[in-house]
Curated annotation (Swiss-Prot):
A divalent metal cation 1 binds at D211, D222, E417. The gene is metap2. Keywords: Aminopeptidase, Cytoplasm, Hydrolase, Metal-binding, Protease. The keyword Thylakoid does not apply. It comes from Dictyostelium discoideum. Its cofactor is Co(2+); Zn(2+); Mn(2+); Fe(2+). GO terms for cellular component: cytoplasm; phagocytic vesicle. It is found in: Cytoplasm. Pfam families: Peptidase_M24 (PF00557). This is Methionine aminopeptidase 2.
Length: 436
């Protein structure tokens, strides 16, 4: 989720399977009269029945998590996906993302036993966010198989979000969707999800950005990609994907955010694209950024620019970052426009007098707290007459609107994004998959 600058296959066996148990055969011999051979007065032996036992779910050790392997091959998933990832990884250890070693003055970290011991302290956090990442990979694989011209955006986001809820075993604030699914088309760069009743249908000429998030215990995966149906847009996608990978490459402990932005812009703007006989430079959208991520807070306080001239603040050990870039054929600057769908609670607190607004705020606190939400989710939960109450909370400053961010009409914007973690020993690109 972007940050704008201030203006059916057979399921695998699981750990929950019960051991099969049959009634133990009665080996006592019985005579024609029906009495046991042990004598007239001997009592009949009762059949013994084994009690069914459930295997205890294994507890992943810190060592198992630290030594987690990349995604194993041969995972079984249905289509559409219905098997939670916890059932696929029965040992409770989820696969790590792509590991990139630190360079230069931090290269010692790769083999430092002291730094490796530090990682063990945070093993459970790593496992939580890797679970969220694995859900993201599997859901987007499914979505990449169903997205096509003629598909409605509402059907697309509902299919994606339902799959996410199932695979992550959504449970209130413990695990679930981290923010509304962005399905921004063409010149719309970010923050568009359909409100209830939206009838928008994908067309062959569209450039679609799919930006969605998952979380476990507040540890968020924020990851996005671009879908097109015409190869004429390939150079736009290639430029943005390369720019994002450049940002990831330059990220690391002690890396300066402004230098990362300069590197991203240099790569992005070395590309151009020809559309309908006219050549367009591909430019970084200067007022969109990547960002740090904190538990339950998608925009964690630090911004990762995608143009030169940014602050020289350093990245630090233990931080999570969403490295995302946007390339545009237009003016390369976005403004807020169109009907709002994204909302998020602020830190501001004040008295709420309107009963409906007070009731809605209680629901938001319980189900989303500081996570972003959308109007469609409120409708889904039965809060279908929420607009006046929601507007009241926005007017009070308790809730903030995040309207769609748009470039110039007629332009095309592409986006790629990954979430990474600056561990003590290495940089882990948590959301990396075999697709991008």
């Amino acid at each position: 989720m972007s940050e704008i600058q201030p203006k059916t296959e057979v399921p695998p066996k699981t750990v929950e399977e019960e051991e099969e148990s049959d009634d133990e055969e009665d080996n006592t011999k019985v005579t024609e009269g029906g009495n046991p051979t042990g004598g007239e007065g001997a009592a009949k032996k009762k059949k013994k029945k084994n009690k069914k036992k459930k295997k205890a779910a294994p507890v992943a050790s810190a060592a198992d998590i630290i030594d987690s392997k990349p995604i194993p091959s041969g995972l079984v998933q249905t289509n559409p996906p219905t098997i939670p990832v916890s059932k696929q990884f029965s040992n409770g250890v989820y696969p790590m993302g792509e590991i990139q070693e630190y360079r230069d003055s931090n290269s010692y970290r790769t083999t430092s036993e002291e730094k490796r011991l530090e990682e063990r302290i945070h093993a459970n956090i790593y496992n939580d966010v890797r679970r969220a990442a694995e859900v993201h990979r599997q859901v987007r694989k499914y979505v990449q198989g169903i997205v096509k011209p003629g598909l409605g955006l509402t059907e697309l986001v509902e299919s994606l979000e339902n799959a996410s809820r199932t695979l992550i075993e959504a449970d209130g604030l413990k695990a679930g969707i981290a923010f509304p699914t962005g399905v921004s088309l063409n010149h719309i760069a970010a923050h568009f999800t359909p409100n209830t009743g939206d009838k928008t249908v994908l067309k062959k000429d569209d450039v679609l950005k799919i930006d969605f998030g998952t979380h476990v215990n507040g540890y968020i995966i924020d990851c996005a990609f671009t879908v097109t149906f015409d190869e004429k847009y390939d150079k736009l996608k290639d430029a943005v994907r390369e720019a994002t990978n450049t940002g990831i490459y330059h990220a690391g402990i002690d890396a300066r955010l402004g230098e990362i932005g300069a590197a991203i812009q240099e790569v992005m703007e070395s590309h151009e694209i020809e559309l309908n006989g006219k050549t367009y430079p591909i430019r970084s959208i200067r007022n969109l950024n990547g960002h740090s991520i904190r538990p339950y807070v998608i925009h964690g306080g630090k911004t990762v620019p995608i143009v030169r001239g940014g602050e020289m603040t350093k990245m630090e050990e233990g931080e999570f970052y969403a490295i995302e870039t946007f390339g545009s054929t237009g003016r390369a600057q976005v403004i807020e426009d169109l009907e709002c769908s994204h909302y998020m609670k602020t830190d501001y607190q004040t008295t709420v007098r309107l009963p409906k607004a007070k009731q809605l705020l209680q629901y938001i606190n319980k189900n989303y707290d500081t996570l972003c939400f959308c109007r469609r989710w409120l409708d889904r939960a039965g809060e279908d007459k929420h607009i006046l109450a929601l507007n009241n909370l926005c007017d009070l400053g308790i809730i903030q609107r995040h309207a769609p961010l748009v470039d110039s009409k007629g332009s095309y914007v592409a986006q790629y994004e990954h979430t990474l973690l600056l561990k003590p020993t290495a940089k882990e690109v948590l959301s990396r998959g075999d697709d991008y």
